[in-house]
UniProtKB/Swiss-Prot annotation:
Native organism: Rana dybowskii
Family: Belongs to the frog skin active peptide (FSAP) family. Brevinin subfamily.
Cystine residue pairs: C60-C66
Protein's recorded name: Brevinin-1CDYd
Entry GO CC: extracellular region
Compartments where located: Secreted
Superkingdom assignment: Eukaryota
Record keyword Calcium present: no
Entry's Gene Ontology BP terms: defense response to Gram-negative bacterium; defense response to Gram-positive bacterium
Length: 66
């Protein structure tokens, strides 16, 4: 139970950091844009796919069930 709480806390912490970094990046890009058509372009989130790709390995390591 403790390892589950610990891993969820780590995921929450990483998600919070990811969200704040993406928000800062999005704000910086919006300041640089001059063309109104470019404002509709979504900001690519690069950290989330990496986190999701490593999640099974992390869970396997934490719970020792592969």
């Amino acid at each position: 139970m403790f390892t589950l709480k610990k891993s969820l806390l780590i995921l929450f912490f990483l998600g919070t950091i990811n969200f704040s970094l993406c928000e800062e990046e999005r704000n910086a890009e919006e300041e640089r844009r001059d063309d109104p058509e470019e404002r509709d372009v979504e900001v690519e989130k690069r950290f989330l796919p990496l986190l999701l790709a490593g999640l099974p390995k992390l869970l396997c390591f934490l719970f020792k069930k592969c």
